Regions:
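Well-ordered alpha-helical segments within folded domains of soluble proteins
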Residues: 3-19, 82-91, 138-139
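Short strand-turn-strand beta-turns centered on an Asx-Gly dipeptide
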Residues: 170-173, 227
Length: 257
């Protein structure tokens, strides 16, 4: 696959704008998936080397020269991807929340703080604590709420990711009853006060995702996904000198974290 880093970033920006237009969590799902798996793959852990393309699979030597190297490199002749990657990582914080005159939408999970003003409610402050994307437990604490004379109810919307089949919600330790479907938002509407605490726990099942059979090169291939993270098998991870083409994954193994 081609998977240019800048094209993945464009996918993030496009779906972010669709989410702003329609408030549909499916667009935030795409933003999250692309950020974690298609944008971050474009830069090395030390931040010094970059991919122009992000190949899904690298095969043995070919009888012709590829335009782009198989490994990340410090210099790319078409130098759009490195600065675009850095810009996107730096501005990802702007995708975490969206607001309306009387609601806050939590689109991306991760440890952060929010300070904003709702047109119909007033100043709002939130602190989010979580080990996401490794764990599905998220804690949100209200650090600023409208003054007593101006208190009005407003809604906090929590994204239910497309991979989440079960979630639990508590407010100030009390369970909130409800069934939340994947690809939606869970809404909590109340008069909030400083110190209120929301505990949102999403199950993170391990899933096997099969490639589209209409794409010949990836037919009968799967990836392992847990939460928002998509995993792949790399040659350096294989012990005993076995070739990657000879490796199989039993479906029962996918359920073993």
């Amino acid at each position: 696959a081609y998977c240019e880093t800048c094209a993945n970033i464009a996918n993030v920006m496009f779906n972010q704008r669709l989410n702003l237009l329609y408030g549909d969590s499916k667009y935030a799902d795409i933003v999250e998936t692309a950020l974690y798996n298609s944008v971050l793959s474009g830069v090395s852990l030390d931040g010094k080397k970059y991919f122009y393309t992000n190949p899904l699979r690298i095969s043995a030597d070919l009888p012709y020269t590829l335009r782009w190297p198989k490994e990340r490199t410090e210099y790319i002749s078409c130098f759009c991807c490195p600065p675009n990657t850095l810009r996107t990582v730096c501005q990802a914080q702007n995708y975490a929340y969206t607001v309306t005159p009387n609601a806050v939408y939590c689109n991306l999970y991760g440890a952060n703080t929010l300070a904003t003003t709702l047109k119909e409610t007033g100043k709002i402050g939130l602190v989010q604590e979580t080990e996401y994307p490794w764990e599905g437990a998220v804690k949100l604490t209200v650090t600023e709420a409208p003054k007593p004379s101006k208190k009005k109810a407003f809604s906090l919307f929590l994204r239910v990711p497309d991979w989440c089949e079960k979630a639990t919600l508590k407010v100030n330790g009390e369970p909130v009853q409800g069934t939340w479907k994947a690809n939606t938002y869970a809404e909590v509407n109340r008069i909030w006060k400083k110190g209120d605490c929301v505990e949102w726990v999403m199950d993170m099942p391990v899933k096997l995702l099969e490639a589209n059979p209409l794409a010949e090169e990836i037919r009968n291939q799967v990836v392992v996904k847990r939460g928002p993270l998509v995993y792949c098998l790399e040659s350096m991870d294989i012990e005993g000198g076995h070739k990657i083409d000879n490796c199989l994954l039993y479906t029962s193994d996918a359920a073993d974290d």
